């Protein structure tokens, strides 16, 4: 199980690197879908099956629609692929950054970090992942509303910046 989790975590880091190198909106959206899927599988591996399912459905329902809308508005006839030299340079830079940070912080910090969700399930009335979701929506409701407004504002700012002084990459709809 440890090797499967290590493989999933490496896949998640590589997916985040593919999103951060951001060659084109199309490839970035694909990378984000892969990172969300692998992250939800990591959550399921640690016992949070309900939370990972809810997060994945929210991601597919909300964020993928936003990415499809942005990709439809981005008029890019020749998108940059991952095989081009500029993108490969940024991918190698991010890989070196991850390896350097991992070697710098290597030590015993990870021993208490990977505790399964239902380790003390005998003493609990509610399952830990559904109780955590209820707590997130009850006490963190205001933060969720603020986060949604910030995401909407970010979308509008990005769409305005791509337009620029002239038409830019924004097509007339």
Curated annotation (Swiss-Prot):
This is NADH-ubiquinone oxidoreductase chain 6. Belongs to the complex I subunit 6 family. Keywords: Electron transport, Membrane, Mitochondrion, NAD, Respiratory chain, Translocase, Transmembrane, Transmembrane helix, Transport, Ubiquinone. The chain crosses the membrane at residues 1-21, 25-45, 53-73, 87-107, 139-159. Its EC number is 7.1.1.2. It is found in: Mitochondrion membrane. One of its GO terms (cellular component) is mitochondrial membrane. It is a multi-pass membrane protein. PANTHER family: NADH UBIQUINONE OXIDOREDUCTASE SUBUNIT ND6, NADH-UBIQUINONE OXIDOREDUCTASE CHAIN 6. The keyword Repeat does not apply. Core subunit of the mitochondrial membrane respiratory chain NADH dehydrogenase (Complex I) that is believed to belong to the minimal assembly required for catalysis. Complex I functions in the transfer of electrons from NADH to the respiratory chain. The immediate electron acceptor for the enzyme is believed to be ubiquinone. The lineage of its organism: Eukaryota, Metazoa, Chordata, Craniata, Vertebrata. GO terms for molecular function: NADH dehydrogenase (ubiquinone) activity. It catalyses: a ubiquinone + NADH + 5 H(+)(in) = a ubiquinol + NAD(+) + 4 H(+)(out). Its main location: mitochondrion. It comes from the Eukaryota. Pfam families: Oxidored_q3. InterPro entries: ComplexI_Subunit6, NADH_UbQ/plastoQ_OxRdtase_su6. It is an enzyme of class 7 (translocase).
């Amino acid at each position: 199980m440890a090797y499967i989790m290590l493989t999933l975590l490496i896949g998640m880091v590589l997916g985040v690197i593919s999103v951060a190198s951001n060659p084109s909106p199309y490839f970035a959206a694909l990378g984000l879908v892969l990172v969300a899927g692998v992250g939800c599988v990591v959550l399921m591996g640690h016992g949070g099956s309900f939370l990972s399912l809810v997060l994945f459905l929210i991601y597919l329902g909300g964020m993928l629609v936003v990415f499809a809308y942005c990709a439809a508005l981005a008029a890019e006839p020749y998108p940059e692929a991952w095989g081009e030299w500029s993108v490969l340079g940024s991918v190698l830079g991010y890989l070196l950054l991850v390896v350097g940070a991992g070697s710098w912080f290597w030590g015993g910090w990870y021993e208490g970090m990977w505790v399964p969700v239902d380790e003390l399930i005998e003493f609990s009335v509610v399952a830990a992942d559904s109780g955590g979701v209820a707590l997130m929506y009850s006490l963190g409701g205001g933060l969720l509303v603020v986060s949604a407004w910030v995401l909407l504002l970010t979308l509008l700012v990005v769409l305005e910046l791509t337009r620029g002084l002239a038409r830019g990459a924004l097509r007339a709809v």
